[in-house]
């Protein structure tokens, strides 16, 4: 093998191994948090904040419709 092919193979292997290592190390914290949440049990979601957010969204949507209806048609 010529040195340029050997260097190319080495660089490709280095990049692939770096991505695999980063992938595995990124899975470890998510796996730990998943196990902790499985042992603790799921928390009940606070739906009040979600409902208020949805009401605000509906209010803004109605205000936008009103504003657009007042604009002249060009």
From Swiss-Prot:
GO cellular component: extracellular region; membrane; other organism cell membrane
Expressed in which tissues: Expressed by the venom gland.
Modified-residue entries (Lysine amide), positions: 40
Purpose of the protein: Has antibacterial activity against Gram-positive bacteria S.aureus, M.luteus, B.subtilis, and Gram-negative bacteria E.coli, and P.aeruginosa.
Propeptide positions: 46-74
GO biological process: defense response to bacterium
Signal peptide (residue range): 1-22
Family in the record: Belongs to the non-disulfide-bridged peptide (NDBP) superfamily. Short antimicrobial peptide (group 4) family.
Protein known as: Peptide BmKb1
Keywords: Amidation, Antibiotic, Antimicrobial, Cleavage on pair of basic residues, Membrane, Secreted, Signal, Target cell membrane, Target membrane, Transmembrane
Subcellular location: Secreted; Target cell membrane
């Amino acid at each position: 093998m010529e040195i340029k092919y050997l260097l190319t193979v080495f660089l490709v292997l280095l990049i692939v191994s770096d991505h695999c290592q980063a992938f595995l190390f990124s899975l470890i914290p998510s796996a730990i948090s998943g196990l902790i949440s499985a042992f603790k049990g799921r928390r009940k979601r606070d739906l009040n904040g979600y409902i208020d957010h949805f009401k605000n969204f509906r209010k803004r949507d109605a205000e936008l419709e009103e504003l657009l209806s007042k604009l002249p048609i060009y």
